[in-house]
Every structure is written in C-alpha cells, then in structure tokens.
Amino acid sequence: MATKNPTKIEMRDLLQAGAHFGHQTRFWNPKMGPYIFGARNKIHIINLEHTVKAFNEALTYVNGLAAKKNKVLFVGTKRAASGVIAEQAARAGMPYVDHRWLGGMLTNWKTLRQSINRLKELEKQAEDGTFAKLTKREALERTRDMEKLERSLGGIKDMGGLPDAIFVVDVDHEAIAIKEAKNLGIPVIGIVDTNSNPDNVDYIIPANDDAIRAVTLYVTSMADAIIAGKEYAQTQAGGKAEQEAPATEEAADAQTEEAATPAE
C-alpha cells in the first residue's frame, strides 16, 4: 500500500545538497564502482541518476510500510546525522538511535527491554514526586541514571518490539546495526558513500553521507514519505485515526531467539 503521490526526490535537490560528492579516490570501495560517474580533483563523483532511482524506490517502500502501520528505525549516530535523525524520526512518529548503537539493540532485544522498563520507571518517579522524597544524593543518582538511559534508549523506548526496517546514514559507521538487522532478516535502507561497503544493504542509496545539508535532505524526505503513508492509511479508513497496534513483545522475543539459535 502506498499513497497515490508518494514523496519524491529530484535530481536538482541532490545536486544543491552536494549529494554527488564522494570521498577521495584513494579511499574508494571498488564495490561502489557501478555507482560512480567519474572523478574531479581526486574526488569521486557519484552518478545521481542511480541515486534518484534508488532513493525514490526506498521512499516508496517506507511509504508503504507506514501505511501498514509498520515501524522504521532511523539510525544515525555520527555528528552530521544525529540531530536531524532524532528530530525527523520523532516528527514521523518513528523510533531512532542517535547517540550510540549498543551491541544487542536488536539481537538482544529481550534483555534490552529491561533497561527500557527501568528508564520508564525512573521517568515515572521523576513525575510523581518520588525523587522529591529522596535524599539529595539519592535523587541525583537516579537523575543521572535516567539521563544516561535516555541518551542511549530514549529514541527506542516506545518501539514496542523489533522494527520492520531500518534506515541508516553511513553504513560503515553503523556496521553493527546493519549486521544485527541482517541476522534477524530486517530489511536495511542505507546511504552508501564511495568509501563504504554496500554488502548487507537491501536498498542501496549511493550518496554523500557527510554533508549536513545532504543528510538533512535524506532524513527529512524519509520522514515525509512515512507521514504521507500514515495519512493515506487514515484516509483509506474513512479519515478515522486508528490507534497503532502495539507490536507483540513475545513475537519480538521469539524472533531474536530464533536468530540466535544455530542451525543444526
């Protein structure tokens, strides 16, 4: 399911954002050869015809996921991506990781959920006046614990279970996240620069992954496509805003346990 007019990205938008500038030629990954137009001043130039086609396919894909009330996890922990990842994922009502990827965020979801429950418990205590009844030292310790957990898990605390896809800015930087997703059979959408390895990425979007203007364009476009998908679903339902069905955590646990079980 998708909107009749899903979000589209145009060649001129990518050019203006500098999405065609790759890395220095000496740092290239040969697997990205098919997506490279040429080189200028020892900098690889990405063929944006490939980028436009791949990006719009990815936008149509996430648009359809959102229309079916599925979840797309936004991942971008480096400086150029973290701010816009948190902002746009929140705008689209999607989970995100913007601080640091903790090993096992997907493959060890059952255990990680305990930390999420602890975060929610501390947030409740902060709101209901429990902290005010503690000694200053105890209140400070709990506040610090809450802030630490919020930095690491705040973006996924309401995810409810494993995502249906992940969108990654800089696939090399987020290699652990991609590996976990692939182990669980979760589709990966990735911005892949000329120095990166496109292996294990289901939707390869060849583009610059460092320029803040370009990264902002990518992430905002993804969020727009998701919002459009949600709005289309509501229109199809007669304009009634249906509550999203929470993912069954039992199903998520079963999925992670199945992936962790070695084949006989």
From Swiss-Prot:
SUPFAM superfamilies recorded: Ribosomal protein S2
Region (Disordered) location: 233-264
Any Pfam family: Ribosomal_S2
Keywords carried by this UniProt record: Ribonucleoprotein, Ribosomal protein
GO molecular function, a single term: structural constituent of ribosome
GO-annotated cellular components: cytosolic small ribosomal subunit
GO biological process: translation
InterPro entries, per database record: Ribosomal_uS2, Ribosomal_uS2_bac/mit/plastid, Ribosomal_uS2_CS, Ribosomal_uS2_flav_dom_sf
Family: Belongs to the universal ribosomal protein uS2 family.
PANTHER family linked: 30S RIBOSOMAL PROTEIN S2 PROKARYOTIC AND ORGANELLAR (PTHR12534), SMALL RIBOSOMAL SUBUNIT PROTEIN US2M (PTHR12534:SF0)
Protein's recorded name: Small ribosomal subunit protein uS2
Species annotation: Psychrobacter arcticus (strain DSM 17307 / VKM B-2377 / 273-4)
Gene that produces this protein: rpsB
